[in-house]
Amino acid sequence: CVASPAKKRTFCEGNAAMELAADESVILAYWQLRDGVADHGFRKGLKYRAAARALERSYRRAAAARPEFDRVTRRQLARLAELEQAKAPSLDEPADAFAQILAAAADEAADAVQRRVLGQMLYHLGRWVYLMDAADDLKRDAESGNYNPLIYRYGLTDGQWTPESRAAFTATADH
């Protein structure tokens, strides 16, 4: 181990899959921090700005290694920001934007069948994660005034589910 060369340690050697996962994680973290800067303004955004700055060198390296994933991530996060600005009532549009990011993680699979299957699996996982996160954040977003498509789709300005909205959301999340 480089950190403790005198002490023998077990470690995992790098491989292509781990490098891919690490690069994609850095790209996602960087853009999430940049989004935090945009969402929180100058003063509250300082911690996000500092963290993004600290990650910048690693981000540039990861983006150079995975330019297509970086491009898809930037494009879909910009799409999400536009939907948030417009206070879009659609559940499918923002869920699709997030799902497209996760689906892009499969683009480097060598086998075409594996790429298609992984892409579909990650797409649906991403859609589900987005919807569940929106449901989990509903009350907090209603209180803080943050965008949440559930508020605009079902008129849940108080952050409380109605029986009808819960049933409609469950049907959407299940498909």
Predicted regions span which residues?
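Acidic catalytic motifs of isoprenoid enzymes
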Residues: 1-120, 127, 131-170
